[in-house]
Amino acid sequence: MIGREYQKYYTPTFFDFVALICAWAFLLLTFPVSIFFCVKIVKEYDRMVIFRLGRLWQDNPRGPGIVLVLPFIDSHKTVDLRVMSYDVPTQEMLTRDSVTIGVDAAVYYRTSDPIASLARVNDAHMSTRQLAQSSLRNVLGTRSLAELMTDRHGIAVQVKYILDSATLFWGIHVERVEIKDIRLPREMCRAMAAEAEAQRESDAKVVTAQGELDASMAFQKAADELAGSPTALQLRYLQTLVKISAHDNHTIVVPFPMEYIKKKIRK
């Protein structure tokens, strides 16, 4: 714990003992009025760090519950342990392939070491937020536009790892990073939409051509089979006549014998 690092070099002096005795004496002489000023209630999600005569007192934060703070010689800071969210302002930057984009992100973090967050950095929350902006810009600048559009999760994990490694010394733990939105220039959006439309049309033409090829091959196979079987050809001829006569129409069909048709074809 960081508290032990500070207390290891601290040796109480004579004046410290005198100040401590005076504080207790004042507390007892003004009792019970002093209770309203010296007794603090720490909530479940908070921790209180006490500094006595400017030095860290005890190596662990106090709370939750009732905490006694001595008058004149004790000062205290309350630290919230709940997860906090920070919406990173829109970052305008260039990708690796020189495309200007705007990125919106959110960072979720919490205080894991209240003492370190007070003793090692002036403002842990502000420092974490500024570091989040710079880390996001640095990571996105090394990725291409295609990577940004397809690998948001991987980028978020990389930014989280960089943030968590740096803020651990400050007593801050980064829970997660989310890439909320990636905005492209209007010209780029129109170009990508046109490219996607052209790709869809190309795919549709390929599918249509493949279908026609399959159908022609099926017809060719059926024709070959019918040509080798006169009975099957005759049956197909009769089926065609039935289909034509099944509907109310004005078509007049005059059937001819198949032998007559074959003779005409041979001629």
Curated annotation (Swiss-Prot):
Q: Which Pfam families match?
A: Band_7 (PF01145)
Q: Could you list the residue ranges that cross the membrane?
A: 17-37
SUPFAM superfamilies listed in its UniProt record: Band 7/SPFH domain
Record flagged with keyword Metal-binding: no
| First-listed, main subcellular location of the protein, grouped into a coarse class | membrane
Give the membrane topology, semicolon-separated if more than one: Single-pass membrane protein
Q: Where in the cell is it found?
A: Membrane
Q: Which InterPro entries match?
A: Band-7_stomatin-like (IPR043202), Band_7 (IPR001107), Band_7/SPFH_dom_sf (IPR036013), Band_7/stomatin-like_CS (IPR018080), Stomatin_HflK_fam (IPR001972)
Gene Ontology CC annotation, any one: plasma membrane
**Alphabetized Gene3D superfamilies for the sequence:** 6.10.250.2090, Band 7 domain
Tell me which UniProt keywords the record has, alphabetically. Membrane, Transmembrane, Transmembrane helix
Q: Which family does it belong to?
A: Belongs to the band 7/mec-2 family.
Q: Could you tell me what this protein is called?
A: Stomatin-3
Source organism lineage? Eukaryota, Metazoa, Ecdysozoa, Nematoda, Chromadorea
Instruction: Tell me what gene encodes this.
Output: sto-3
